[in-house]
Amino acid sequence: MIHHFITKLIATVVAAFCLTSCTIGGDDTDEYGSGLLQKGTPAPDFTIYTDSHPEGFALSSLQGQYVLIEFWASWCPDCQKETENMKRLYATYAPLGVVFVGVSFDTDKEEWQQYIHDNGLDWIQYSELKPWKESTLSTAYNIKWIPTLYLIDKEGRVVQGTVDVNAMDTLLASLNLNGQ
């Protein structure tokens, strides 16, 4: 009787482990990337202020070009892990005409600028210098996790939103960017 109970208990524990290991060890990008703007949605416009453009320029002024927007922060461990991958994407696709825009949720301007400088993030960088949850852009783009990437097409519409840098790389590689 006890042997039968122990056998059932072990079988139950093994089954539970197998079922949960699919989610625990699995891909969390579906959960964190849920609720992002859908393909074809007009990208919410915003004005980007940088040291080189202190008067600012609108995201919509980049229509006619693909734009990759990366929502990130210097204090974010996942963003830090993806820095080299983002630099690789920039080196690969910026020469093909993709405009890269980093939107940071940093609140300390000096730390943010130091991270950009130390890591050679050579694309457009912008921050409202507000906490993530207080950012108007976080709300407009339904950001639940960082880094989050959006590819905007030449007409200003969302092609894809994702928390997976590799998925964005695959998408960019599938586009006919050489033919512009």
Each predicted region: which residue ranges?
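N-proximal helix/coil linker or "cap" segments that precede and/or mark the start of modular domains
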Residues: 22-45, 60-63, 114-117, 174
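Bacterial Sec-dependent N-terminal signal peptides
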Residues: 1-30, 179
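Conserved segment of the thioredoxin-like fold in thiol-based oxidoreductases
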Residues: 91-133, 143-146
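Conserved redox-active cysteine motifs that mediate thiol-disulfide chemistry
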Residues: 71-88
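A short beta-strand-turn-helix
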Residues: 46-67
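Thiol/disulfide oxidoreductase modules built on the thioredoxin-like
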Residues: 121, 129-176
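Short pre-active-site segment immediately N-terminal to redox-active cysteine/selenocysteine motifs
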Residues: 65-67, 71-75, 145
